[in-house]
Amino acid sequence: MKRVLTALAATLPFAANAADAISGAVERQPTNWQAIIMFLIFVVFTLGITYWASKRVRSRSDYYTAGGNITGFQNGLAIAGDYMSAASFLGISALVFTSGYDGLIYSLGFLVGWPIILFLIAERLRNLGRYTFADVASYRLKQGPIRILSACGSLVVVALYLIAQMVGAGKLIELLFGLNYHIAVVLVGVLMMMYVLFGGMLATTWVQIIKAVLLLFGASFMAFMVMKHVGFSFNNLFSEAMAVHPKGVDIMKPGGLVKDPISALSLGLGLMFGTAGLPHILMRFFTVSDAREARKSVFYATGFMGYFYILTFIIGFGAIMLVGANPEYKDAAGHLIGGNNMAAVHLANAVGGNLFLGFISAVAFATILAVVAGLTLAGASAVSHDLFANVFKKGATEREELRVSKITVLILGVIAIILGVLFENQNIAFMVGLAFAIAASCNFPIILLSMYWSKLTTRGTMLGGWLGLITAVVLMILGPTIWVQILGHEKAIFPYEYPALFSISVAFLGIWFFSATDNSAEGARERELFRAQFIRSQTGFGVEQGRAH
């Protein structure tokens, strides 16, 4: 059990980010014209969709939630497209390529947060909210303070995630396309701004759907060709892989990648609860018409992602067999050309030739675009809807709110490009871990307790939420990744790499203690309002649906 927990928990560094899979040194490849042409086709097609979407974005609801008219199936595909990343595809298959069986536990670890979203969050979130999760958190609590806290939690997560994605995008494109790093970062930033600025959630949704379909098709074809090579026998697949892998039979043994059980548990909790607190994922539940469609979204998304992560396992073992044993894909020193993260890309060449290699490379780039578009829209909505329209200028018109949102998109895009260039040679892997830790320590406790705990008050939410956020940031800075590796100190003050176990505990305890000891009249009123909130969260009575949403 300890081994399984350890391996499962260690998935966090690979979770939903392109940067972490390729955060080390990369070796620039020759210009891949097939990949560039296929990617240009994707860009032209998606820009056409953005133009089509821009003609249909007439209101705030259209911009933030595509009018609430996305079906459960479409939204499930879009969620999968938002969550399945280049790290999932390249990083996990590379992990299987080097470590074998552990990669399966890693693949399954990606799904561990989704049952929480399905059973605890999706239905109530849709019934209580309109555009952002702050709508839910502030439903019966004080609007101003809660929205500021929720927006800060969202923006910090989005900023960290976005920087990691931009750096990852630059390195990935350097690997796959042979393009200059700076050109790659600017290209991703400009396309991201165009999708969100003109097409809003409708364009973002269709970019994510198209990317998910392309990625699932590409991975399915690769897995099919691998299985065809071994006569559709898993026994043959594993036997041939063990025969050519340097570790031999040891690649079928689990565990051993994370030694410390406290770190393992902390990572696992960060991944599980962090997924349920990611603002760009939560925002997708407002794009459907009702709670039933929200539940269907999670059901379909989990199915698509589960299928995809099983494919990455087959692809990893296929790479051991068809790439690892082929000197054509090795350099003079005997290492894989471009590094181990190129294992899946080389396999694409091995099973489908140059044309399919170009297709897979283009899909990897499309993967990053889909993720950053969702992040940018989530960040913009936190500023325009939560802060501008509900805190700083109450009663702002829809037109004013949309103008602020689009200005925020431009600012976020420019900042992302600048920081992507500045962080080119920095260790940015910790940013994703910190983003998940903050989502788990600030956003998740607030969402969960606001929907389920009748005694929650504004005072408890504010003090506990800020404590969780600050604890996550401080412990991350004092931990070995930043304190030792980046700042150069000899020994870390906080001994564990990821802080989620401790910061989540601080957040929940803080919210409970300061709410339980809140004897104010305001606190009593907020507790009384829970009954009405509970009825709406269960029945959906009064929820705006579809185009009226």
UniProtKB/Swiss-Prot annotation:
Superkingdom: Bacteria
Keywords: Cell inner membrane, Cell membrane, Ion transport, Membrane, Sodium, Sodium transport, Symport, Transmembrane, Transmembrane helix, Transport
Subcellular location: Cell inner membrane
Transmembrane segments: 33-53, 77-97, 103-123, 148-168, 183-203, 206-226, 262-282, 303-323, 355-375, 404-424, 428-448, 464-484, 493-513
Membrane topology of the entry: Multi-pass membrane protein
A GO molecular-function descriptor: glycolate transmembrane transporter activity
Annotated CDD domains: SLC5sbd_u4 (cd11480)
One Pfam family of this chain: SSF
Coiled coil regions, renumbered to chain: none
One Gene Ontology biological process: sodium ion transport
GO CC term (a single one): plasma membrane
Family to which the UniProt record says this protein belongs: Belongs to the sodium:solute symporter (SSF) (TC 2.A.21) family.
Function: Transports acetate.
HAMAP family per the UniProt record, alphabetical: Acet_symport_ActP
Protein name, UniProt field: Cation/acetate symporter ActP
Organism: Shigella boydii serotype 18 (strain CDC 3083-94 / BS512)
Upper lineage: Bacteria, Pseudomonadati, Pseudomonadota, Gammaproteobacteria, Enterobacterales
